[in-house]
Amino acid sequence: AGRVDDLISLINGDIPKGSWGIAHTRWATHGAPNSVNAHPHPDCHNNIFVVHNGIIENYRELKDKLLKEGHVFISDTDTEVLSHLIEKYFPAKGTGGSASPKGGKNNLEQAVIKALKLVKGAYGLAIVAQDDPGKIVAVKNSSPIVIGLGDGEAIVASDASAILTHTKQVVYLN
């Protein structure tokens, strides 16, 4: 939690290696602005991670139901509900669950669609799963999402100004 400049000094130049990732500068609407409530938010098995711009209006109702089903929450945010909802339809490998296999594999995009049918509110989301590496699912409802296309890369943001230093080629998700 804190300013981007603070993160840069915290990692001390030790930038993680990888081919995909998500992050979010959060405007706190649910839960205090602290490291526990900082994005991305994981599911119970640290498989699915979600960043979210918006407000989930029915998060309390959804969270109560998920708690009764045995989900464990670590934050006070509405966002964490999303990772647990998606987990119901895209469980981590070896954990069982109610996912509908497609071609013998769980399908992250279909899990997101199923989960979001239960959600009321405005959102711009970026979702990744360790069990489906290299893929970022971006989805929106009444909140902006822009995708920047660069040299061998795609960048998802809620505002074009966040990515214009990387690319001038942007597509607004409808």
Predicted regions and their residues:
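Conserved short alpha-helical segments that host acidic/polar catalytic motifs at enzyme active sites
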Residues: 1-174
